[in-house]
């Protein structure tokens, strides 16, 4: 009876360990949404430095950015971080509609999972304010064309909806001995 009790106890411990371990791990859907949120904020971050160019001449600015594929001229080859679906200019803003993708994998062996998804956003560059606003946009058939497993609505993501100059402070000025120094105060 002791031998049987030991086996039962070991089985219970194993079941509890597996239950606790898998119960604490984030789901694949959570990981995909986190990946998409990171990608949206990454788009805000990388486009901030081109904000003035995008506001003044958006077509030329976008043409010079190799990390944005332009789906308006044909199918994107998938070698870009972001896919431009539309570009709209008005008197008070420029709006880029982008498809942003993300993905995740979890587990290993029999528990391995992999998923990818896309969300579509409008990045609005107001002409009168140094900011970038992000809003949800319709993806159309981009998900079917590119083979994404799911389209995640922008509203399901937790991201900054507005970035301003306060989000991008200037780098700290550092001088090195023996070299020229452009820092204030020399």
Positions of predicted regions on the chain:
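Bacterial N-terminal signal peptides that target proteins for export
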Residues: 1-12
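Bacterial signal peptide processing site
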Residues: 25-28
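Conserved non-transmembrane functional hotspots
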Residues: 59-85
């Amino acid at each position: 009876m002791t031998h049987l009790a030991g086996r039962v106890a070991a089985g219970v411990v194993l079941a509890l360990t597996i239950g606790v371990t898998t119960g604490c791990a984030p789901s694949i859907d959570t990981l995909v949404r986190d990946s998409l949120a990171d990608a949206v904020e990454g788009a805000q971050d990388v486009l901030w430095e081109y904000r003035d160019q995008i506001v003044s001449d958006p077509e030329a600015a976008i043409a010079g950015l190799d990390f944005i594929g332009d789906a308006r001229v044909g199918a994107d080859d998938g070698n870009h971080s972001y896919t431009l679906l539309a570009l709209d200019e008005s008197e008070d803003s420029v709006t880029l509609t982008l498809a942003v993708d993300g993905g995740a994998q979890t587990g290993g062996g029999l528990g391995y999972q992999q998923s990818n998804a896309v969300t579509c956003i409008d990045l609005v560059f107001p002409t009168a304010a140094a900011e970038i606003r992000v809003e949800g946009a319709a993806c159309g058939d981009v998900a079917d064309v590119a083979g994404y497993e799911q389209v995640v609505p922008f509203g399901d993501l937790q991201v900054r909806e507005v970035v301003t100059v306060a989000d991008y402070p200037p780098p700290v000025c550092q001088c090195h001995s023996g070299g020229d120094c452009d820092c204030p105060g020399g």
